[in-house]
């Protein structure tokens, strides 16, 4: 994506200086989005390979005799369980640490949060540059880990993305150590970004922009930054203990030496459950702006929406052990975590019903971003989450495909759909060129149908008792697995089509000649700027009359 060059010094910058040494928040946001897209392509490819293997009973592709891309019934195939575990592990690690948070928080957050509050840039521009390049190092370490010697004398670490001991402490090779370092570096870049976001939000708002006149996306990114700042150091401590157990003879998680592997589960999930909301809260902000724009109405209940996000963030820190009902806990503990978990449905419901109220009576325009917002099926994942909040039911569904379906309705049809909504909503603003509407809508329908075909049948597989993370299964599970795999192929084709749409838009899309190419209800400050925005924005700070009429939330 290009940005307008405002003076002769900037015109002399080459490609390397512009993109590798930039401290401009807009350039860094674009870099985050581009790198997250590459990591996402790798992760989605691993997903398709998993679904190829699971389409039919028996092992056809992941063989000890060698990986295959075409099934050969006549050739011998000894199941390669390590390869399967590696594919599952790196799909999770890449998606959780290197795709969704960097795209929503690092990409859209860096680009639009300063614009929404009228700030010239981030508070610490050089720190912003450092956090991006640490992110690149983290992605590189993760890919290096995938290709490095691991267990069973094969590449990669096959322990699952949660890195549970004793699997992670006994896995041979240094692929496991590189994976832990990759997560460490990912945490460092997120913490640095969070410090920058918090400082910018609190200190660089436009004159007269009080806290409760800040747009919802900026609020979402700000609250997410606090969650990152409070939870990631806990994970850092846990995986540091893993490294110590692996390399320095400590026994934090080894029962033979007085350690406790369940301690790691508490550490991981104290970070892991807030992470779910770190992934989804920026998406909430994007969806709020998209719905308000295309319903042609101000968002309903602005203040309750802000308070609901803050409540979700707070409650996210006190429900972690609902992931651990089967690890053993007292009835009193289980009762508390059940009640606390179900309480999160209240602020989440406030957001969902506020979106519905915003659309009610509005003049809805079904452009591509609005389609993604309407298909934002986080609610389905939330409803199934209330189901498995019950300890008695969770004992039945734990480690079955019901959990896979629940989680991916939150992540894939939640956070990922929010990324697509934000991309189509803002790509014209970022690039100065607009996507073809027919192509965006075709991509939406392909992805919507494909994603639901993947994950909705997995609820049935879970109810039938199919365990997750298995390379093979009895023939009784074949019907829904076949449908799920067909959905994966459709979704993968739609993702490749999306990449084509992005490149077509950047190089041949219809030029955007107006600041606001949607309507008057796209009312945040970026819509007062040219498309694309100039290299330096708000060198003269916006006055209240520039934004207050549009931001008068009551």
UniProtKB/Swiss-Prot annotation:
Subcellular location: Cell inner membrane
Annotated PANTHER family: CYTOCHROME C OXIDASE SUBUNIT 1
Name of encoding gene: ctaDI
Binding sites annotated in the UniProt record for Fe(II)-heme a: 91, 408
Database matches in PROSITE patterns: COX1 (PS50855), COX1_CUB (PS00077)
Membrane topology, record value: Multi-pass membrane protein
First-level EC class: translocase
Binding locations of Cu cation: 273, 277, 322-323
Protein name: Cytochrome c oxidase subunit 1-alpha
Keywords: Cell inner membrane, Cell membrane, Copper, Disulfide bond, Electron transport, Heme, Hydrogen ion transport, Ion transport, Iron, Membrane, Metal-binding, Respiratory chain, Translocase, Transmembrane, Transmembrane helix, Transport
Reaction it catalyzes: 4 Fe(II)-[cytochrome c] + O2 + 8 H(+)(in) = 4 Fe(III)-[cytochrome c] + 2 H2O + 4 H(+)(out)
Biological or metabolic pathway of the protein: Energy metabolism; oxidative phosphorylation
Pfam (any one): COX1
Recorded family membership: Belongs to the heme-copper respiratory oxidase family.
Main location: membrane
GO biological process: electron transport coupled proton transport; oxidative phosphorylation; respiratory electron transport chain
UniProt organism field: Paracoccus denitrificans
